[in-house]
Amino acid sequence: PAFRMRFWNLGANGQVLVGCLASAACMFYLGGKVPDGVVNIIMIVSAIAAGILWAVIPALFKAFFGTNETLFTLMMNYIAEGLVGFFVSLWATDGSGVLRPMSDGRLPMIVSQYFAVVFVAVLITGAVSVYLRFSKHGYEIDVVGESINTAKYIGINVKKVVIRTLALSGAICGVVGLLLTGGINFTVNSELHGGMGFTAIMTVWLAKFNPIMIIATCFFVSFITKGMAQVRLDFGFTDEATANI
């Protein structure tokens, strides 16, 4: 949604990380003390709230002070990494600086470990597609993206649209963090996002900001990435050679 509004949000990595951190905090402090179902509910709310907070901060500065969102959101990534590093060192009981996978408070596994992740991703993609195409908010996002002056002229509250849209983007990133920590890795570290925020920029541009087409471009990028990894193993290519291919 943010890119469709021409708000260049480069902070998805940080927004995902704070979602991971919020989920890990719930698992660490509440896991084993309260029922897992209650922990899961608190995790969901906390991860989404953390993602929203991390996205709304630059949105507020953009809306009220005209701050460059590209630089601001990029810097927020490094702050998120620092926060994660601090809490991991605090929680690591063995002095290794590594938080080992936690067994309590995990999200329930449906069919397989990755099925729920894929299901949620498809569900969010469909919901966002409907939201952008058929809702008043989606129309306002398109108008603001095309021309801020036109949006103001027809009575759209641009500041409100910017903040609301970034809150939605942050919420989605928070859900991603929730799934990474609560459903797949059961821990957190500063590299857990795997650079997916920057990969998402490429897939979104390839899809021309169309949520449904993003599914196809994500598969395309995944095929290339995994295929090149297999080529490297089969033919002994270097990492640099496969990256260039």
Where are these regions (language model features)?
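Transmembrane helix-bundle core of multi-pass membrane transporters
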Residues: E69-F134, T187, D239-T242
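Transmembrane alpha-helical segments in multi-pass inner-membrane proteins
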Residues: A167-C173, L179-I245
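Alpha-helical transmembrane segments in inner-membrane proteins
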Residues: P1, V34, G51, P58-A59, ...
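Aromatic-anchored segments of alpha-helical transmembrane domains
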Residues: S23-C26, Y78-V84, G174, V221-V231
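Generic alpha-helical transmembrane segments of integral inner-membrane proteins
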Residues: L21, I41, V45, A49-I57, ...
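Helix-loop-helix "hairpin" substructures at the membrane interface of multi-pass membrane proteins
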Residues: I110-T187, P211-I212
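Alpha-helical transmembrane segments of multi-pass membrane proteins, especially transporters
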Residues: A12-C20, V39, M43-G51, E69-N77, ...
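Single transmembrane alpha-helix segments in multi-pass membrane proteins
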Residues: P1-L30, I44, I48, I52-T67, ...
